[in-house]
Design a protein with these regions (language model features):
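Alpha-helical bundle regulatory/interaction domains
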Residues: 1-150
Length: 150
């Protein structure tokens, strides 16, 4: 792709990286999430990352402003915000108004992104279905449950 054509589509290389994450990793799971197929969505995310592991392990090394970690967290946040907004339809949480869709989307985006980054950092040696099991465990157990199990 020549430079002029590139800049007709993307602002910079970081914009391109966000596009790749959205298109290759998150778009394929959108339909699964909308149909409450959460485990299948997790396995697909980790499988697609692993399929292009060399690319994502290099991208992981991008640090500082516009780091890969920041880009992926924002992409996950955008997807979750959309999904939460569809279900909540603008209504505040009945018991905790502070829990806005934005707050919940950011919390879960950071959580998911942490697991993704640790998995990439560790060389993606754990199988996608096992990483999905780990994430499901973390999400279904409170901090207090986990402390009691130690």
């Amino acid at each position: 792709m020549i430079r002029v054509t590139f800049y007709n589509h993307f602002q910079d290389k970081y914009d391109l990286l966000g596009y790749i994450v959205r298109r290759e990793i998150l778009e394929p799971v959108r339909i699964l999430l909308r149909n409450s197929m959460y485990r299948e969505a997790l396995i697909l995310i980790f499988s697609n990352l692993r399929k292009d592991s060399a690319f994502y392990q290099r991208a992981y090394k991008i640090e500082g402003q516009n780091s890969f970690e920041e880009i992926t967290e924002n992409c996950i946040y955008e997807l979750l915000l959309e999904l939460f907004s569809e279900r909540r339809s603008g209504k505040p949480h009945s018991k905790f108004p502070w829990l806005t869709v934005e707050t919940m989307a950011r919390y879960y985006a950071r959580s998911m992104n942490y697991v993704v980054m640790e998995w990439i950092r560790s060389g993606m040696t754990v199988a996608p279905d096992e990483v999905a099991d780990i994430y499901e465990y973390i999400m279904s157990h409170s901090l207090w449950d986990t402390l009691d199990e130690l």
